[in-house]
Protein backbone atom coordinates (compact mmCIF):
# COMPACT_ATOMS: atom_id res chain seq x y z
CA UNK A 1 0.00 0.00 0.00
CA UNK A 2 1.43 3.36 -0.98
CA UNK A 3 2.24 5.79 1.79
CA UNK A 4 -0.22 8.60 2.27
CA UNK A 5 0.96 12.12 1.55
CA UNK A 6 0.59 14.73 4.29
CA UNK A 7 -2.34 16.17 2.32
CA UNK A 8 -4.12 12.79 2.22
CA UNK A 9 -3.40 12.15 5.89
CA UNK A 10 -4.95 15.50 6.83
CA UNK A 11 -7.99 14.73 4.73
CA UNK A 12 -8.44 11.27 6.25
CA UNK A 13 -8.13 12.63 9.78
CA UNK A 14 -10.60 15.50 9.37
CA UNK A 15 -13.19 14.13 6.98
CA UNK A 16 -15.95 11.98 8.38
CA UNK A 17 -18.74 9.81 7.04
CA UNK A 18 -21.60 12.26 7.50
CA UNK A 19 -23.12 13.87 4.47
CA UNK A 20 -22.85 17.64 4.10
CA UNK A 21 -26.28 18.26 5.60
CA UNK A 22 -25.31 16.55 8.84
CA UNK A 23 -21.95 18.26 9.29
CA UNK A 24 -23.72 21.25 10.81
CA UNK A 25 -26.46 19.20 12.40
CA UNK A 26 -29.32 20.27 10.15
CA UNK A 27 -30.99 16.94 10.76
CA UNK A 28 -30.81 17.28 14.54
CA UNK A 29 -33.02 18.95 17.08
CA UNK A 30 -33.33 22.69 17.43
CA UNK A 31 -31.80 22.39 20.89
CA UNK A 32 -28.50 21.29 19.33
CA UNK A 33 -28.54 24.27 17.01
CA UNK A 34 -29.17 26.63 19.90
CA UNK A 35 -26.34 25.04 21.86
CA UNK A 36 -23.86 25.72 19.06
CA UNK A 37 -25.07 29.17 18.05
CA UNK A 38 -24.99 31.67 20.86
CA UNK A 39 -27.41 34.46 20.05
CA UNK A 40 -27.01 37.95 21.39
CA UNK A 41 -25.18 41.13 20.56
CA UNK A 42 -21.62 41.61 21.71
CA UNK A 43 -19.37 44.62 21.26
CA UNK A 44 -15.69 43.67 21.29
CA UNK A 45 -14.28 46.91 19.93
CA UNK A 46 -13.79 49.96 22.09
CA UNK A 47 -12.99 53.37 20.69
CA UNK A 48 -11.78 54.47 17.28
CA UNK A 49 -8.79 52.85 15.60
CA UNK A 50 -5.44 54.61 15.20
CA UNK A 51 -4.78 56.38 11.89
CA UNK A 52 -4.51 53.99 8.96
CA UNK A 53 -1.16 53.19 7.42
CA UNK A 54 0.00 51.62 4.21
CA UNK A 55 2.56 48.83 4.39
CA UNK A 56 4.11 48.62 0.94
CA UNK A 57 6.00 45.48 1.92
CA UNK A 58 2.70 43.87 2.80
CA UNK A 59 1.64 43.79 -0.85
CA UNK A 60 4.86 42.46 -2.34
CA UNK A 61 4.08 39.72 -4.85
CA UNK A 62 5.82 36.46 -5.54
CA UNK A 63 7.42 36.32 -8.97
CA UNK A 64 6.14 33.30 -10.95
CA UNK A 65 8.23 31.83 -13.73
CA UNK A 66 7.03 31.42 -17.30
CA UNK A 67 6.41 27.70 -16.72
CA UNK A 68 4.60 28.39 -13.46
CA UNK A 69 2.28 30.89 -15.14
CA UNK A 70 1.49 28.36 -17.87
CA UNK A 71 0.58 25.73 -15.27
CA UNK A 72 -1.56 28.19 -13.34
CA UNK A 73 -3.49 29.10 -16.47
CA UNK A 74 -4.15 25.41 -17.13
CA UNK A 75 -5.60 24.81 -13.65
CA UNK A 76 -7.24 28.14 -12.77
CA UNK A 77 -10.69 27.03 -13.93
CA UNK A 78 -10.67 24.45 -11.11
CA UNK A 79 -10.54 27.32 -8.61
CA UNK A 80 -13.49 29.29 -9.98
CA UNK A 81 -17.22 29.21 -9.12
CA UNK A 82 -19.65 27.37 -11.38
CA UNK A 83 -20.13 29.04 -14.76
CA UNK A 84 -23.75 29.97 -13.99
CA UNK A 85 -22.91 31.48 -10.59
CA UNK A 86 -22.92 35.16 -11.60
CA UNK A 87 -26.16 34.77 -13.56
CA UNK A 88 -27.87 33.05 -10.63
CA UNK A 89 -26.69 35.79 -8.28
CA UNK A 90 -28.06 38.55 -10.46
CA UNK A 91 -31.35 36.73 -11.05
CA UNK A 92 -31.95 36.15 -7.35
CA UNK A 93 -35.15 35.15 -5.66
CA UNK A 94 -36.23 32.32 -7.96
CA UNK A 95 -35.97 28.59 -7.47
CA UNK A 96 -32.34 27.57 -7.46
CA UNK A 97 -31.20 31.19 -7.67
CA UNK A 98 -28.86 32.75 -5.13
CA UNK A 99 -29.52 35.73 -2.89
CA UNK A 100 -27.06 38.50 -3.71
CA UNK A 101 -27.57 39.96 -0.25
CA UNK A 102 -26.19 36.77 1.32
CA UNK A 103 -22.95 37.27 -0.57
CA UNK A 104 -22.74 40.98 0.23
CA UNK A 105 -23.40 40.43 3.93
CA UNK A 106 -20.68 37.80 4.08
CA UNK A 107 -18.17 39.97 2.20
CA UNK A 108 -18.98 43.01 4.36
CA UNK A 109 -18.15 40.94 7.44
CA UNK A 110 -14.95 39.56 5.85
CA UNK A 111 -13.79 43.09 4.96
CA UNK A 112 -14.47 44.40 8.45
CA UNK A 113 -12.50 41.67 10.21
CA UNK A 114 -9.78 41.66 7.56
CA UNK A 115 -9.24 45.37 8.12
CA UNK A 116 -9.39 44.98 11.90
CA UNK A 117 -6.52 42.47 11.91
CA UNK A 118 -4.61 44.02 8.99
CA UNK A 119 -4.43 40.72 7.16
CA UNK A 120 -2.62 40.50 3.82
CA UNK A 121 -4.60 41.41 0.68
CA UNK A 122 -4.35 37.82 -0.56
CA UNK A 123 -6.19 36.65 2.57
CA UNK A 124 -9.26 38.70 1.63
CA UNK A 125 -9.06 37.48 -1.96
CA UNK A 126 -8.85 33.84 -0.85
CA UNK A 127 -11.78 34.26 1.55
CA UNK A 128 -13.98 35.66 -1.22
CA UNK A 129 -12.81 32.91 -3.57
CA UNK A 130 -13.84 30.24 -1.04
CA UNK A 131 -17.16 32.02 -0.45
CA UNK A 132 -18.06 32.27 -4.14
CA UNK A 133 -17.06 28.71 -4.94
CA UNK A 134 -19.01 27.38 -1.96
CA UNK A 135 -22.16 29.39 -2.73
CA UNK A 136 -22.05 28.23 -6.35
CA UNK A 137 -22.06 24.58 -5.24
CA UNK A 138 -24.01 24.49 -1.97
CA UNK A 139 -27.48 25.86 -1.29
CA UNK A 140 -27.79 27.33 2.18
CA UNK A 141 -30.95 26.28 4.04
CA UNK A 142 -33.80 28.78 4.03
CA UNK A 143 -34.63 30.52 7.27
CA UNK A 144 -31.17 30.10 8.78
CA UNK A 145 -29.71 33.61 8.61
CA UNK A 146 -27.00 32.68 11.07
CA UNK A 147 -25.41 30.45 8.43
CA UNK A 148 -24.37 33.47 6.36
CA UNK A 149 -22.29 34.81 9.22
CA UNK A 150 -20.97 31.34 10.06
CA UNK A 151 -19.93 30.79 6.44
CA UNK A 152 -18.10 34.13 6.40
CA UNK A 153 -16.25 33.22 9.60
CA UNK A 154 -15.25 29.84 8.19
CA UNK A 155 -14.05 31.24 4.85
CA UNK A 156 -11.93 33.96 6.46
CA UNK A 157 -10.59 31.53 9.06
CA UNK A 158 -9.48 29.10 6.34
CA UNK A 159 -7.96 31.91 4.27
CA UNK A 160 -6.03 33.21 7.28
CA UNK A 161 -4.70 29.72 7.99
CA UNK A 162 -3.50 29.50 4.39
CA UNK A 163 -1.85 32.92 4.20
CA UNK A 164 -1.19 34.46 7.63
CA UNK A 165 1.62 33.62 10.05
CA UNK A 166 -0.31 34.97 13.05
CA UNK A 167 -3.86 33.58 12.99
CA UNK A 168 -6.35 34.67 15.69
CA UNK A 169 -8.45 32.09 17.51
CA UNK A 170 -11.78 31.47 15.80
CA UNK A 171 -13.64 33.15 18.67
CA UNK A 172 -11.46 36.26 18.35
CA UNK A 173 -12.31 36.56 14.65
CA UNK A 174 -15.87 37.48 15.63
CA UNK A 175 -15.29 41.17 16.27
CA UNK A 176 -17.78 44.00 16.45
CA UNK A 177 -21.48 43.80 17.15
CA UNK A 178 -22.89 40.55 15.79
CA UNK A 179 -26.23 38.82 16.20
CA UNK A 180 -24.54 35.46 16.68
CA UNK A 181 -21.36 34.29 18.34
CA UNK A 182 -20.27 30.80 17.35
CA UNK A 183 -18.39 28.26 19.39
CA UNK A 184 -15.08 26.95 18.07
CA UNK A 185 -16.50 23.49 17.38
CA UNK A 186 -19.29 24.98 15.25
CA UNK A 187 -16.80 26.97 13.18
CA UNK A 188 -14.65 23.85 12.75
CA UNK A 189 -17.63 21.89 11.43
CA UNK A 190 -18.39 24.67 8.96
CA UNK A 191 -14.75 24.71 7.88
CA UNK A 192 -14.98 20.98 7.19
CA UNK A 193 -18.10 21.53 5.10
CA UNK A 194 -16.33 24.22 3.07
CA UNK A 195 -13.22 22.05 2.67
CA UNK A 196 -15.16 19.03 1.48
CA UNK A 197 -17.40 21.07 -0.84
CA UNK A 198 -14.34 22.68 -2.45
CA UNK A 199 -12.59 19.28 -2.66
CA UNK A 200 -9.73 20.58 -0.51
CA UNK A 201 -8.55 22.90 -3.28
CA UNK A 202 -7.60 25.73 -0.96
CA UNK A 203 -4.35 26.89 -2.59
CA UNK A 204 -6.54 28.79 -5.01
CA UNK A 205 -5.35 30.52 -8.16
CA UNK A 206 -6.34 34.19 -7.88
CA UNK A 207 -5.41 37.40 -9.73
CA UNK A 208 -2.65 37.83 -7.15
CA UNK A 209 -1.02 34.70 -8.60
CA UNK A 210 -0.30 36.59 -11.83
CA UNK A 211 -0.29 40.31 -11.25
CA UNK A 212 3.43 40.70 -10.53
CA UNK A 213 4.28 38.71 -13.66
CA UNK A 214 2.14 40.98 -15.83
CA UNK A 215 3.39 44.17 -14.14
CA UNK A 216 6.97 43.10 -14.83
CA UNK A 217 6.09 42.30 -18.44
CA UNK A 218 4.83 45.86 -18.85
CA UNK A 219 7.86 47.28 -17.03
CA UNK A 220 10.52 45.74 -19.25
CA UNK A 221 11.17 42.86 -16.85
CA UNK A 222 11.93 45.13 -13.89
CA UNK A 223 10.07 44.88 -10.55
CA UNK A 224 6.95 47.06 -10.34
CA UNK A 225 6.98 50.18 -8.21
CA UNK A 226 5.43 50.23 -4.76
CA UNK A 227 2.68 52.43 -6.16
CA UNK A 228 1.85 49.88 -8.86
CA UNK A 229 1.77 47.06 -6.32
CA UNK A 230 -0.51 48.97 -3.97
CA UNK A 231 -2.88 50.11 -6.68
CA UNK A 232 -3.03 46.63 -8.21
CA UNK A 233 -3.90 45.11 -4.83
CA UNK A 234 -6.59 47.68 -4.21
CA UNK A 235 -8.11 47.18 -7.65
CA UNK A 236 -8.14 43.39 -7.34
CA UNK A 237 -9.91 43.60 -3.99
CA UNK A 238 -12.42 46.15 -5.29
CA UNK A 239 -13.18 43.83 -8.21
CA UNK A 240 -13.50 40.83 -5.89
CA UNK A 241 -16.25 42.56 -3.92
CA UNK A 242 -18.45 43.03 -6.97
CA UNK A 243 -20.08 40.58 -9.34
CA UNK A 244 -19.17 42.19 -12.65
CA UNK A 245 -15.99 40.17 -13.17
CA UNK A 246 -17.09 36.81 -11.78
CA UNK A 247 -17.14 35.34 -15.28
CA UNK A 248 -13.52 36.20 -16.01
CA UNK A 249 -10.56 33.98 -15.26
CA UNK A 250 -8.06 35.16 -12.61
CA UNK A 251 -5.38 35.56 -15.31
CA UNK A 252 -7.68 37.80 -17.36
CA UNK A 253 -8.47 39.98 -14.35
CA UNK A 254 -4.80 40.26 -13.38
CA UNK A 255 -3.79 41.19 -16.92
CA UNK A 256 -6.53 43.82 -17.16
CA UNK A 257 -5.57 45.26 -13.76
CA UNK A 258 -1.88 45.43 -14.67
CA UNK A 259 -2.71 47.16 -17.95
CA UNK A 260 -4.99 49.63 -16.17
CA UNK A 261 -2.40 50.47 -13.53
CA UNK A 262 0.38 51.02 -16.07
CA UNK A 263 -1.92 52.76 -18.53
CA UNK A 264 -1.38 50.33 -21.42
CA UNK A 265 -4.78 50.10 -23.07
CA UNK A 266 -3.55 47.81 -25.83
CA UNK A 267 -1.34 45.49 -23.77
CA UNK A 268 -1.13 41.84 -24.80
CA UNK A 269 0.19 38.78 -22.96
CA UNK A 270 1.06 35.35 -24.30
CA UNK A 271 -0.97 33.43 -21.72
CA UNK A 272 -4.16 35.51 -21.90
CA UNK A 273 -6.80 35.72 -24.61
CA UNK A 274 -6.59 39.24 -26.01
CA UNK A 275 -10.33 39.62 -26.61
CA UNK A 276 -11.26 38.36 -23.15
CA UNK A 277 -8.70 40.66 -21.56
CA UNK A 278 -10.00 43.65 -23.53
CA UNK A 279 -13.54 42.83 -22.45
CA UNK A 280 -12.41 42.66 -18.82
CA UNK A 281 -10.72 46.05 -19.21
CA UNK A 282 -13.98 47.49 -20.52
CA UNK A 283 -15.88 46.09 -17.54
CA UNK A 284 -13.37 47.58 -15.10
CA UNK A 285 -13.59 50.94 -16.86
CA UNK A 286 -17.39 50.80 -16.67
CA UNK A 287 -17.10 50.19 -12.93
CA UNK A 288 -15.17 53.50 -12.73
CA UNK A 289 -12.69 52.06 -10.28
CA UNK A 290 -9.69 53.78 -11.81
CA UNK A 291 -9.10 56.84 -13.97
CA UNK A 292 -6.57 59.66 -14.33
CA UNK A 293 -6.61 62.32 -11.65
CA UNK A 294 -7.93 65.54 -13.23
CA UNK A 295 -5.09 67.69 -11.84
CA UNK A 296 -2.35 65.58 -13.39
CA UNK A 297 -2.39 63.01 -16.22
CA UNK A 298 0.40 61.09 -14.45
CA UNK A 299 -1.68 60.51 -11.36
CA UNK A 300 -3.99 57.54 -11.21
CA UNK A 301 -6.32 56.73 -8.36
CA UNK A 302 -9.03 54.37 -7.23
CA UNK A 303 -12.32 56.22 -7.34
CA UNK A 304 -13.87 56.97 -3.97
CA UNK A 305 -17.17 58.17 -5.42
CA UNK A 306 -18.69 54.74 -5.96
CA UNK A 307 -21.84 54.29 -3.87
CA UNK A 308 -22.78 50.99 -2.27
CA UNK A 309 -25.34 49.19 -4.41
CA UNK A 310 -26.88 45.70 -4.63
CA UNK A 311 -24.02 44.73 -6.93
CA UNK A 312 -21.66 46.20 -4.35
CA UNK A 313 -18.48 47.16 -6.12
CA UNK A 314 -16.76 48.41 -2.97
CA UNK A 315 -17.22 50.50 0.15
CA UNK A 316 -16.31 54.12 -0.37
CA UNK A 317 -13.87 53.78 2.51
CA UNK A 318 -12.00 51.05 0.69
CA UNK A 319 -10.44 53.50 -1.75
CA UNK A 320 -6.93 54.86 -1.77
CA UNK A 321 -5.66 57.88 -3.66
CA UNK A 322 -2.19 57.20 -5.07
CA UNK A 323 0.37 59.87 -5.86
CA UNK A 324 3.44 59.74 -8.06
CA UNK A 325 5.75 59.72 -5.00
CA UNK A 326 4.43 56.24 -4.10
CA UNK A 327 2.64 57.48 -1.00
CA UNK A 328 -1.03 56.92 -0.31
CA UNK A 329 -3.76 58.62 1.64
CA UNK A 330 -6.55 56.49 3.00
CA UNK A 331 -10.01 57.86 3.63
CA UNK A 332 -11.75 57.60 6.99
CA UNK A 333 -15.44 57.21 7.47
CA UNK A 334 -17.83 56.33 10.23
CA UNK A 335 -19.05 52.77 9.82
CA UNK A 336 -22.44 53.09 11.40
CA UNK A 337 -23.37 49.53 10.52
CA UNK A 338 -20.59 48.24 12.77
CA UNK A 339 -20.86 50.82 15.51
CA UNK A 340 -17.28 52.14 15.31
CA UNK A 341 -15.13 54.11 12.93
CA UNK A 342 -12.58 52.22 10.88
CA UNK A 343 -10.87 52.14 7.52
CA UNK A 344 -12.26 49.20 5.60
CA UNK A 345 -9.51 48.93 3.01
CA UNK A 346 -7.70 45.62 3.47
CA UNK A 347 -4.62 47.18 1.89
CA UNK A 348 -4.48 50.27 4.08
CA UNK A 349 -5.27 49.32 7.65
CA UNK A 350 -3.48 49.10 10.95
CA UNK A 351 -3.94 46.26 13.43
CA UNK A 352 -5.66 46.92 16.73
CA UNK A 353 -5.76 44.57 19.66
CA UNK A 354 -9.09 43.19 20.83
CA UNK A 355 -10.16 44.68 24.15
CA UNK A 356 -10.87 41.87 26.56
From Swiss-Prot:
Xref: InterPro entries: Cyclin (IPR039361), Cyclin-like_dom (IPR013763), Cyclin-like_sf (IPR036915), Cyclin_C-dom (IPR004367), Cyclin_N (IPR006671), Cyclins_cyclin-box (IPR048258)
GO cellular component: cyclin-dependent protein kinase holoenzyme complex; cytoplasm; nucleus
Domain of life, source organism: Eukaryota
Keywords: Cell cycle, Cell division, Cyclin
GO biological process, any: cell division
Family the UniProt entry places it in: Belongs to the cyclin family. Cyclin D subfamily.
Protein name, as recorded: Cyclin-D4-1
Record organism: Oryza sativa subsp. japonica (Rice)
Gene encoding the protein: CYCD4-1
